[in-house]
Amino acid sequence: MEEALRAWMLNRPDLGKCLIIAGKPEGGVREDGTVTTWYDPTSEELAHALATADTVVCRSGYSTLLDLAVLGRTAVLVPTPGQPEQEDLARHWARAFGFATCSQTELEAGRVPQPAGNPPHVRPNEIAIARLRAWTEIPTLEPAH
């Protein structure tokens, strides 16, 4: 996906500066004209990049979709070839939330749709904290009269 994205970005001068987050543990940064690739960003760098990007093109794995939902971002979803759960998730998010999708083959051919959709509105930390409190509260027992 990285090379296909880089080729697409370099052929689209209208996109301006672009950032690829490859998520590979070897670290480092690669510069190719207007395209920068981060190989091992911190959580803070990743959140800032997603929050401030004009366009997000990403895989449709569970953790990526959770990041998009928490940040309230739309994206073009590109399922990993041969990963049926990512294909199912991309189809579901396209139907349920209007997200744009394309296949790896379409990405490699430079046929990337405009991002679209309305991510689900979630407040996971508030919900999790409320549930945790409810599960861990010890009820006070009133003395029997």
Segments from the language model and where they lie:
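Donor-nucleotide binding loops and adjacent catalytic segments primarily
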Residues: 1-55, 65, 87-91, 105-106
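Alpha-helical elements of Rossmann-like donor-binding domains used by nucleotide-donor carbohydrate transfer enzymes
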Residues: 4-7, 52, 92, 111, ...
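A general structural signal for well-ordered secondary-structure junctions
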Residues: 15-18, 56, 99-100, 118-121
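Short, well-ordered beta-strand core segments
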Residues: 56-57, 75
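Short glycine-/small-residue-rich Rossmann-like dinucleotide-binding loops
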Residues: 61
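Catalytic binding pocket for nucleotide-activated donors in carbohydrate/polymer assembly enzymes
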Residues: 65, 69-120
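C-terminal amphipathic helix plus adjacent low-complexity
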Residues: 111-145
